[in-house]
Regions:
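Short Gly/Thr-rich strand-loop-strand
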Residues: 115-135
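Short helix/turn-capping signatures at newly exposed starts of structured segments
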Residues: 27-122, 163-168
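Bacterial N-terminal signal peptides
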Residues: 16-25
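Short, exposed beta-strand-loop hairpins at the edges of beta-sheets
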Residues: 144-154
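Terminal recognition/anchoring or ligand-binding modules at protein termini
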Residues: 133-138, 147-148, 166-168
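Short, hydrophobic/proline-enriched secondary-structure or compact coil segments at domain edges
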Residues: 154-164
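Bacterial N-terminal signal peptides that target proteins for export
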Residues: 4-16
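Ser/Thr-rich, low-complexity intrinsically disordered terminal regions
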Residues: 67-73, 128-138
Length: 168
């Protein structure tokens, strides 16, 4: 009797463990977006949102003497500047890679950005001054990723998130 009870407990425990592992695998496989462009969230940090008060910025995002903030995104070192509107609200965020990135690295960065927002970055045609550039739009906000140099090869990448201008 004791042996049967012990086997049932082990079997129940095994079933529970298998269910838990399945849940972990299933949630790990879903492509959860980390940031919502529709809400103005910034890909660099869950604490940054367009329209938030510049006075309420977390300490790590406060620019000292207007110098860029150094951080990392997708494994690439970036220099970030934040811009406020007249009301003191965060209007735009610009991140520039500190190193020249190869076209493969640029594509890797683009894919990571697309995954973080769960939106495609659409290639922009007819932009001769910036031949490798992509846009993403949602909910009145835009992400613009392009090369700093006007070439198709290696170069510094600029990623800017901002509110789209409204028609007057």
């Amino acid at each position: 009797m004791f042996l049967i009870s012990k086997m049932k407990k082990k079997r129940s425990l095994l079933v529970v463990m298998m269910l838990a592992i399945s849940m972990i695998i299933m949630t790990g496989c879903t492509n959860k977006k980390a940031y919502s462009l529709e809400k103005g969230e910034i890909f660099l940090s869950p604490t940054l949102t367009l329209g938030m008060s510049m006075e309420g910025l977390p300490e790590e995002w406060v620019q000292v003497r207007n110098l860029p903030i150094r951080t990392e995104y997708a494994g690439f070192p970036m220099e970030v500047t934040l811009e406020a509107d007249e009301a003191g609200k965060l209007r735009s965020v610009k991140a520039i890679s500190q190193d020249e990135l190869t076209t493969d690295q640029q594509d890797e960065l683009r894919k990571t950005l697309s995954q973080d927002y769960d939106l495609p970055l659409t290639a922009v045609q007819n932009r001769e001054e910036q031949p490798r550039s992509w846009l993403m739009d949602e909910g009145g906000y835009r992400v613009d990723m392009s090369l700093l140099a006007s070439s198709y090869g290696d170069g510094e990448v600029v990623i800017e998130v901002y509110a789209q201008p409204t028609a007057k």
